[in-house]
């Protein structure tokens, strides 16, 4: 899929807004090359909850991230928000 064909966020699957960031499911530091489109708030949430090593161990699988309780909670909360919704990202304690 080309960057021009992107219509939904890789993490939350909501339609994308005017701002799109490109996330490496397997971090570049771990030799990941693929990128996927995400909302900025979704991108910050991923990196707030997972280290690069944890992301690399997941092998870029969305399913392994959404099983995480905090990510599942975030996805339920963000589901009804508009595509360009912005909110501060809370880091786990």
Regions found by a protein language model. Name each.
Residues 5-37:
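Histidine-centered nuclease catalytic patch
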Residues 1-3:
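N-terminal leader/targeting segments and the first structural element of proteins
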Residues 86-93:
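Long, charge-rich low-complexity segments
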Residues 32-37, 45-85:
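Polybasic, low-complexity binding patches
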């Amino acid at each position: 899929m080309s960057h021009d064909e992107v219509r939904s966020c890789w993490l939350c699957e909501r339609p994308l807004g005017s701002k799109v960031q490109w996330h490496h499911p397997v971090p570049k530091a771990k030799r990941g090359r693929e990128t996927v489109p995400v909302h900025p708030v979704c991108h910050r949430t991923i990196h707030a909850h997972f280290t690069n090593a944890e992301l690399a161990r997941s092998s870029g699988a969305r399913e392994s991230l959404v099983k995480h309780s905090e990510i599942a909670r975030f996805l339920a909360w963000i589901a009804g928000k508009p595509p360009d919704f912005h909110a501060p990202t809370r880091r786990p304690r």
